[in-house]
Amino acid sequence: MDYCSLLVVSFLITVMTVLASKENDHELIKNPQNSLSSWISSSSSSSSMLVDVCNWSGVKCNKESTQVIELDISGRDLGGEISPSIANLTGLTVLDLSRNFFVGKIPPEIGSLHETLKQLSLSENLLHGNIPQELGLLNRLVYLDLGSNRLNGSIPVQLFCNGSSSSLQYIDLSNNSLTGEIPLNYHCHLKELRFLLLWSNKLTGTVPSSLSNSTNLKWMDLESNMLSGELPSQVISKMPQLQFLYLSYNHFVSHNNNTNLEPFFASLANSSDLQELELAGNSLGGEITSSVRHLSVNLVQIHLDQNRIHGSIPPEISNLLNLTLLNLSSNLLSGPIPRELCKLSKLERVYLSNNHLTGEIPMELGDIPRLGLLDVSRNNLSGSIPDSFGNLSQLRRLLLYGNHLSGTVPQSLGKCINLEILDLSHNNLTGTIPVEVVSNLRNLKLYLNLSSNHLSGPIPLELSKMDMVLSVDLSSNELSGKIPPQLGSCIALEHLNLSRNGFSSTLPSSLGQLPYLKELDVSFNRLTGAIPPSFQQSSTLKHLNFSFNLLSGNVSDKGSFSKLTIESFLGDSLLCGSIKGMQACKKKHKYPSVLLPVLLSLIATPVLCVFGYPLVQRSRFGKNLTVYAKEEVEDEEKQNQNDPKYPRISYQQLIAATGGFNASSLIGSGRFGHVYKGVLRNNTKVAVKVLDPKTALEFSGSFKRECQILKRTRHRNLIRIITTCSKPGFNALVLPLMPNGSLERHLYPGEYSSKNLDLIQLVNICSDVAEGIAYLHHYSPVKVVHCDLKPSNILLDDEMTALVTDFGISRLVQGVEETVSTDDSVSFGSTDGLLCGSVGYIAPEYGMGKRASTHGDVYSFGVLLLEIVSGRRPTDVLVNEGSSLHEFMKSHYPDSLEGIIEQALSRWKPQGKPEKCEKLWREVILEMIELGLVCTQYNPSTRPDMLDVAHEMGRLKEYLFACPSLLHFSSQETQGEASS
């Protein structure tokens, strides 16, 4: 990125002090995103410099004195150092330079603004060095945010202990490298403090007792430091308004030499608004007693994991009726899982793993309607898996491994159709693998682990329906029979472990043809015959283990076998070949060359039969296309001419509305023609889509088709048509003007000078698009396949609601998968329709002569999701990587996604939300990647339908609402206070 090389703020000051009369001063600014274009253009064209400054982007002046009182140039990708000359803005109340790339140190001169400055935000930059103690002079400061920089050294005492301590409400120094203690002594009274965010530093010492004076505190986050001492019970007891308390990953202990948690829980009894409590990773000792019932009924999340808490889980925890997350994992808890947990009807995630819990899993857990994750792994639980788990329709991850569970795998688990992970490994389960489970869990997309049990019988053929699953582990059981060749249908499979069973017969070659398989272990079975060549020819296989079978034949050291050692073939005495340590093969006699023509003739005949017949059939099939009657389209157009819903607009009215289709009104162009913005006589703002006369013959069918679809469909997420205008040589669609342009402009703001969206907005937009396309596929009066879904065809209204547009190449669908063309539309088997759509978004089957289907739109939507997360256009990936966006993302999934998720988070990170929400944001981004990969699978039949996709996007949208906003102290409130 080309960062600014000039101090932007310094330039502002030189202009204000009328030192900017030199014509070339504006040329010193390197402004890569053109974020400050108004500064440059106005300073070079206007004679009244002072007035111009007040009109500049990010600048606000006092209306009476025209003195600059606010400077907010946050989130504009600016760089350079912050100039000390900022102190010359003596009337400044708000200074916000956050979310840029400023480097260097914080100028101590900012402290001279003590008479006026109320809000200072320098967060999310690259600033380093110490925090200047001069900032302690800012005695009117209300809001201080220096978080997410590279600051080091100790926190200056003056920052907390001076005149400003009476006014400071918000302090964020988080995510730096600050050391030393929290500098609060008995003389410091931060009485107005509501937010204290010091997480992810290197702070030591105890929580200062004088913090108890901050009785208005709502949010205290000291997580991920090196703080020590007893949990600050006396401090917390004086904070009745506390809503969020994060003390995880420090070195705190409980009372009475780390044996008693009771005083701390008692101190929280006054905090009736408490919503989240996190104490994880402190090695806290003690028990969770019945006093937990006195905690706030508003509690939503409790994190007590990674401690040394012992005793049982008190049934009284069921009094916390609003709890959605309970994490007690990695402790020393014993006793049974309380049945009373079923009273927590809002529970979504329960983590009880890695404890010493005993008894049976309560069947009542199956009555928690929203439960999406249950992890009770690594305990001493016994008994059977409850049948009631089949009631958990929202269950996505079920982890029961590492217990002493017995009985069979319940068939009812097949009802948990949203399961992504099922891990029942390392138990004492018996019986066969239920057909009802594997046949219904088609959506299982992460892993299935049934290893280390006593399961018997064959692998059900229905397992092959799991075409989304990434990993299957059935090892260390008593399974028998053949390995089904149908497992080759699990096309997403990357890891397959069938070792230590009783499988016999030959190894199916279809496993070697799995396109993403990386690891295969079939050791310790009774497999016979040769290793199929497909395994050696695989380009993805990295780890193979064929040991201790009865395999025979020649093994080459070529292809995927080139990096294998003899350890992959131990105990297979009948194998020979060129692997180091393996016995060499005996030479075979060569057949006379006279047999070669005979063999070729025997092979050629069936090949011609196999490949020739489909070609003949395909040519016949192309002649039997069903088409829409041309008369139907024309009759409909005549009928709509008198429809009051579509007012008639003359050609002259459109000329007047668009200024004669002036170039200044042009807002877009494409193959079909041009789009102009305009204003009708009733002040309606419109977009006029005009068909180019030069291409009228070629695209007239597209024009009619778009008219037809827009008039027949109505949905809040589809563009509506105002009317049409046609005359000889002129065809136009009149549509509402979308003030926020296309999604493409927001995904690539550097190209279009648009503001970035955030993750919440993007998920809402994708949810809107999915709803719109689902309507077209399943509920529209005429079923429609869009065929060209991409960011530029998604428009955003003034409320950032997404509307799908551009139906010029859509197909009308008559049956479930039967495409019916309009008068000029043909199958994708024709030259005209072969690659109908946009490169990078076109489903691969369209390039092989397949007809338009709803699966193609699902593919395009998946590409859209992957594009949003990766920040890369699919065409860029094709050019630079030589692969599709799906293949690019698949190569990073799941182990190498951290960098991609980090970059996505840096681009789309929501503002005005606590850093604590980052865990949730990462999960949402990961799920967007997973959904994108599922939607872009090569085989169309394995993709979900758009109703399922819309449901998933709706769930992610609701999931994001779980993260609270900064409750009281919004930036608007701060600015309002600053300007008062």
From Swiss-Prot:
Its EC number is 2.7.11.1. It is an enzyme of class 2 (transferase). LRR repeats lie at residues 65-89, 90-113, 115-138, 139-162, 165-189, 191-214, 215-238, 240-263, 271-295, 296-320, 322-344, 345-370, 372-391, 392-416, 417-440, 442-463, 464-490, 491-514, 515-537, 539-563. Glycans are attached at residues 55, 88, 152, 162, 175, 213, 257, 270, 322, 327, 380, 391, 428, 449, 497, 545, 554. It catalyses: L-seryl-[protein] + ATP = O-phospho-L-seryl-[protein] + ADP + H(+); L-threonyl-[protein] + ATP = O-phospho-L-threonyl-[protein] + ADP + H(+). It is a single-pass type I membrane protein. It is found in: Cell membrane. Residues 615-980 are cytoplasmic. ATP binds at residues 667-675, 689. One of its GO terms (cellular component) is plasma membrane. Pfam families: LRR_1, LRR_8, Pkinase. GO terms for molecular function: ATP binding; protein serine kinase activity; protein serine/threonine kinase activity. It comes from the Eukaryota. The keyword Protein transport does not apply. Keywords: ATP-binding, Cell membrane, Glycoprotein, Kinase, Leucine-rich repeat, Membrane, Nucleotide-binding, Phosphoprotein, Receptor, Repeat, Serine/threonine-protein kinase, Signal, Transferase, Transmembrane, Transmembrane helix. The active site is at residue 788. Residues 1-20 form the signal peptide. The modification Phosphotyrosine is found at residues 775, 841. Belongs to the protein kinase superfamily. Ser/Thr protein kinase family. This is Putative leucine-rich repeat receptor-like serine/threonine-protein kinase At2g24130. It comes from Arabidopsis thaliana.
